[in-house]
């Protein structure tokens, strides 16, 4: 394709070929570009990084794949829109939980908890407090029905404790309860005092539990990206919309022109106002961007020469506060490799991002030493920085206190010939890969309909849905699910 200063306008004028620019190559952007390409659009995808995937980032520097970003398929079932692709590629999944609950064990079925002195907490106590935590959350549901005013889940729990003294815990039992709350904070990528009581359990959960992508998500994103015109290192700085075209300018000064654009950048980037819109977006759209909340969860991945820890899904350190708690995902069970993943969220994750990678890895290892004092030093490590990375500025969206859920839909709704996609635009599946994927398909379909309606050629093309061309054949290949 010619490297000219404008894209799409001349093609449209000469041949009436519909054109679109997609901004962002995460799952939403790749899905949208793939769908539009399959609908016979001329498509260019602009990506600010030197790689595709966005918050999908499979790293191979250890000699095997590990995901620094999203790694779970939430909803291991045929209903998951990603299941057909994963099944056809023959990618194995390791089911970490058959339970689709988010109450306290959304992605783990076995775990070993320790106090800060390295003493393992009796499993009977761990299970007992898990049930107490579930009861507490059920009681917060009753509290929600009493008032229309939204409060944080932390405040709601405090009220429940005050009303139900028998649910209060002391000593090590209190610390275990804090660990469960810490796990809940990890699900939302923020602290409990920022999680909405009204909205925390309103997402739609697909059946089938949760599965780790054993070989990472990169094979899926690479498959969807095959054959697309992707321009890496193209950071969008301005989007100008006209009645019949969109002009997108990147940091080098080059401008691309097309009939429409799909904006699939993370919510954090939109909130930072690093992309100028001309004319400005409507107030209701700016409000959605401003009011929606984005959290931070990171991974510090420690690679060891051998396994020296218990054969459980999670290792955890309990503490008197959620900030002092920690947990490690044991990748050895899923992949066979001696790897532990430390996963801080919220304020702790932001504080750790201020450290160097070496210091962050050392901090994670110090948490492990609390569990296993004789732990061997890691031979390699990887550290994510989703909160401070200028290409993301956050991990994923969560329900903030006092914020209406219609903000997700407001963020999704098109503005003229601008269409929006990404996990933050998914009303049902916020914060998930399949949510991002689905919104990309939705934005592509809306874009197709608008552009072709303007061309008065609605019958010209027939778009497969979910727009993957021959990749979405009716033949269904079962998912490869294991428990080691």
UniProtKB/Swiss-Prot annotation:
What is the annotated localization of this protein? Answer: Peroxisome
Give the metabolic or biological pathway. Answer: Amine and polyamine degradation; spermine degradation; Amine and polyamine degradation; spermidine degradation
Q: Which domain of life is it from?
A: Eukaryota
The cross-references to Gene3D superfamilies, in alphabetical order and at most eight, read: 3.90.660.10, FAD/NAD(P)-binding domain (3.50.50.60)
Q: Which UniProt keywords apply?
A: FAD, Flavoprotein, Oxidoreductase, Peroxisome
Q: How is the cofactor bound?
A: Binds 1 FAD per subunit.
Intervals of motif Microbody targeting signal: 482-484
List residues binding FAD: 47, 55, 236, 423
Do the record's keywords include Oxidoreductase?
yes
What does it catalyze?
Answer: spermine + O2 + H2O = 3-aminopropanal + spermidine + H2O2; N(1)-acetylspermine + O2 + H2O = 3-acetamidopropanal + spermidine + H2O2; norspermine + O2 + H2O = norspermidine + 3-aminopropanal + H2O2; spermidine + O2 + H2O = 3-aminopropanal + putrescine + H2O2
Q: Which GO terms describe its cellular component?
A: peroxisome
Q: Which cofactor does it need?
A: FAD
The catalytic activity of this protein is classed by the Enzyme Commission as 1.5.3.-
Q: Which GO terms describe its biological process?
A: spermidine catabolic process; spermine catabolic process; thermospermine catabolic process
Give one GO molecular function term: spermine oxidase activity
Tissues/organs with expression: Widely expressed.
Q: What the protein does?
A: Flavoenzyme involved in polyamine back-conversion. Catalyzes the oxidation of the secondary amino group of polyamines, such as spermine, spermidine and their acetyl derivatives. Substrate preference is spermidine > norspermine > thermospermine > N(1)-acetylspermine > spermine. No activity detected when putrescine is used as substrate. Plays an important role in the regulation of polyamine intracellular concentration.
The text of the family note is: Belongs to the flavin monoamine oxidase family.
This protein is called Polyamine oxidase 3
Organism of derivation: Oryza sativa subsp. japonica (Rice)
Its lineage reads:
Eukaryota, Viridiplantae, Streptophyta, Embryophyta, Tracheophyta
State which gene encodes it.
PAO3
């Amino acid at each position: 394709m010619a490297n000219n200063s404008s894209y799409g306008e001349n093609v449209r004028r000469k041949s009436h070929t519909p054109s679109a620019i997609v901004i962002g190559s995460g799952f939403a952007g790749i899905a949208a570009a793939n769908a539009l390409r399959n609908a016979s659009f001329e498509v260019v995808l602009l990506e600010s990084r030197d790689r595709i995937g966005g918050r999908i980032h499979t790293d191979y520097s250890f000699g095997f794949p590990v995901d620094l970003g999203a790694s779970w398929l939430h909803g291991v079932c045929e209903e998951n829109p990603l299941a057909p692709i994963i099944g056809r590629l023959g990618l194995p999944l390791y089911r970490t939980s058959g339970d689709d609950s988010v109450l306290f064990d959304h992605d783990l079925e076995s775990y070993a908890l320790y106090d800060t002195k390295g003493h393992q907490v009796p499993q009977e106590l761990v299970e007992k407090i898990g049930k107490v935590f579930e009861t507490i959350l059920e009681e917060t549901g009753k509290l929600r029905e009493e008032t229309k005013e939204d409060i944080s889940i932390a405040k709601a729990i405090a009220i429940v404790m005050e009303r139900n003294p028998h649910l209060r815990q002391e000593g090590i039992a209190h610390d275990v309860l804090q660990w469960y709350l810490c796990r809940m904070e990890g699900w939302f990528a923020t602290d409990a005092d920022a999680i909405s009581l009204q909205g925390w359990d309103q997402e739609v959960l697909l059946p089938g539990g949760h599965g780790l992508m054993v070989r990472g998500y990169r094979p899926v994103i690479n498959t969807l990206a095959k054959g697309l015109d992707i321009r890496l290192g193209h950071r969008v700085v301005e989007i100008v919309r006209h009645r019949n075209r969109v002009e997108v300018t990147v940091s080098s000064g080059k401008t691309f022109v097309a009939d429409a654009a799909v904006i699939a950048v993370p919510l954090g980037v939109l909130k930072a106002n690093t992309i100028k819109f001309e004319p400005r977006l409507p107030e209701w759209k700016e409000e959605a961007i401003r009011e929606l909340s984005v959290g931070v969860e990171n991974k510090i991945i420690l690679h060891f020469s051998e396994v020296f820890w218990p054969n459980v899904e999670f290792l955890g350190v309990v503490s008197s506060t959620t900030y002092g708690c920690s947990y490690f995902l044991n990748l050895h069970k899923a992949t066979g490799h001696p790897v532990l993943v430390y996963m801080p969220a919220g304020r702790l994750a932001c504080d750790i991002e201020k450290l160097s990678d070496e210091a962050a890895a050392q901090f994670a290892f110090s948490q492990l030493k609390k569990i296993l004092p004789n732990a061997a030093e890691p031979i390699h490590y990887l550290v994510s920085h989703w909160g401070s990375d200028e290409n993301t500025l956050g991990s994923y969206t969560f329900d903030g206190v006092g914020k209406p859920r219609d903000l997700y839909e407001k963020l999704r709704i098109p503005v003229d010939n601008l269409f929006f996609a990404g996990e933050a635009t998914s009303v049902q599946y916020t914060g998930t890969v399949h949510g991002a994927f689905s919104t990309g398909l939705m934005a592509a379909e809306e874009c197709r309909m608008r552009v072709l309606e303007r061309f008065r050629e609605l019958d010209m093309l027939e778009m497969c849905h979910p727009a993957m061309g021959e990749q979405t054949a009716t033949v269904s290949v079962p998912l490869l699910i294991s428990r080691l």
